[in-house]
Amino acid sequence: MKIEDKLVTSVISGLKALYGQDVPAAQVQLQKTKKEFEGHLTLVVFPFLKMSKKGPEQTAQEIGEYLKANEPAVAAFNVIKGFLNLTVASATWIELLNEIHADAQYGIVSADENAPLVMIEYSSPNTNKPLHLGHVRNNLLGNALANIVMANGNKVVKTNIVNDRGIHICKSMLAWQKYGKGETPESSGKKGDHLVGDYYVAFDKHYKAEVAELMEKGMSKEEAEAASPLMNEAREMLVKWEAGDPEVRALWQMMNNWVYTGFDETYRKMGVGFDKIYYESNTYLEGKEKVMEGLEKGFFFKKEDGSVWADLTAEGLDHKLLLRGDGTSVYMTQDIGTAKLRFADYPIDKMIYVVGNEQNYHFQVLSILLDKLGFEWGKSLVHFSYGMVELPEGKMKSREGTVVDADDLMAEMIATAKETSQELGKLDGLTQEEADDIARIVGLGALKYFILKVDARKNMTFNPKESIDFNGNTGPFIQYTYARIRSVLRKAAEAGIVIPEVLPANIELSEKEEGLIQMVADFAAVVRQAGEDYSPSGIANYVYDLVKEYNQFYHDFSILREENEDVKLFRIALSANIAKVVRLGMGLLGIEVPDRM
């Protein structure tokens, strides 16, 4: 039983005994005692002054005396201006640690058969280039969010919508056709997504050269762009694709498959995956159908040029284009089509879209449209909106080939982690295979943690050098502390020490030890809160605070060399449960922790 619940029950009994009044539990406010005061939990007594008919200090004193006499969990109390600070007894903290120790998945709630089904969409790549740093933030947030939502007792379906059609895809295809000379991933030794990305860059280079040439001949920039033979060929290719031209479709299929093989490798290395992948080429026609259905029902209207619009002025928005005059779709149409397919595939209770904050308006509109079209979860659609990520050098552009690829970034992080770990002697005594694995775990952990510790809504700068630091609020610092605890536990096991189910309760704990148990116990509430707020950063920063406190404890107290056997057992058990919570917390973020370092 939570200590807070135990104390609330006793406070209710005390108010009845002292003042003859029944008080609902919701009226009893307990909060953590401020650091500058003595105690663990503080009771706010102001709501009880009417029934006590006394001043705040006297009321607090009377309730404190009652609790000290009748509730074994209260060892002492003090009163500061109507706030009753309660010190929890050591035996109660030890009892709480026993409960946490008995639960291997402490803080994690499993879904039962009646649990709500939450679908989370993330990644959403284009098939004309590799995944880049922006996708890294998206994938890491989406994956962590899925884990956190699942840890709160929900069923989760992780889904991806691949943007596999459109003019941008045709640009890569046309460039390969013109300049590729039959090059393949096998013949070039390149990953398929990188090879296709090279041709996207090549298209842009040739297109810019054409435009410059036409401008030299006296055309304006707009005229030159409209007259570019290369761009017109790309547009023709798109028309052929839409018409199902067998040659264009075969080329599209071949190049997309190269990209998917490359994506799979990147996702695997990053440690993210999906339960279901949707492709825009399958969903955009469904969207058109649904829009036409909405038009028939009078939800939408048609303009003279044949384009279909939604009038959202009643919702405080404007008119939104859903189908162009020539019948071609826009992004909104595709999202409606994807929603239709998903709703047919799964009984979705909630839909979360992990998409950058530049799309805030888009999802505001989508929510209204889905609701109009009869999707039950339309109104409660969640846009998990996150900020942009940059490197210290500045922004990224993929058309010009100056983008930071996810593969290159991960490889660089792993190489830097290896170098740094070797310099600090963290890999001493390990085999080559073990050292490589540690470098992978530390490098990717540094990347993931640095991105996930930041509030998702904020823009951020990812600093690779800063992220691989074994001190401070970083992944490697947390991983090293975990490995340090595992080393303590191994030595304890080698000495034949076994943690009992029930620890001796006859020891006096230090303030630091009580504080650590309180922090470990908080993990369950932190997971709940992260689920309510959709906040991976809440978990990340909690884990950092916990290991920072543990490191101080490790420095100031003997563990294995402690002479009192009961105290030694307690400290080993405390260390084991801190390691467990660190592993579970980092696991929710998709970060591995090494057993040794």
UniProtKB/Swiss-Prot annotation:
Catalytic activity annotation: tRNA(Arg) + L-arginine + ATP = L-arginyl-tRNA(Arg) + AMP + diphosphate
SMART domains per the UniProt record, alphabetical: Arg_tRNA_synt_N, DALR_1
Xref: PROSITE patterns: AA_TRNA_LIGASE_I
Alphabetical keyword list: Aminoacyl-tRNA synthetase, ATP-binding, Cytoplasm, Ligase, Nucleotide-binding, Protein biosynthesis
Record's subcellular location: Cytoplasm
GO biological process, one term: arginyl-tRNA aminoacylation
Motif placement: 'HIGH' region: 125-135
MF GO annotations: arginine-tRNA ligase activity; ATP binding
Top class in the EC scheme: ligase
Pfam families: Arg_tRNA_synt_N, DALR_1, tRNA-synt_1d
InterPro entries xref list: aa-tRNA-synth_I_CS, Arg-tRNA-ligase, Arg-tRNA-synth_N, Arg-tRNA-synth_N_sf, ArgRS_core, DALR_anticod-bd, Rossmann-like_a/b/a_fold, tRNAsynth_Ia_anticodon-bd
Keyword DNA repair found: no
Cellular component, GO, one term: cytoplasm
Keyword Transport belongs to the record: no
EC number(s) on file: 6.1.1.19
Subunit structure: Monomer.
Family: Belongs to the class-I aminoacyl-tRNA synthetase family.
Protein name (record): Arginine--tRNA ligase
Organism expressing this protein natively: Bacteroides fragilis (strain YCH46)
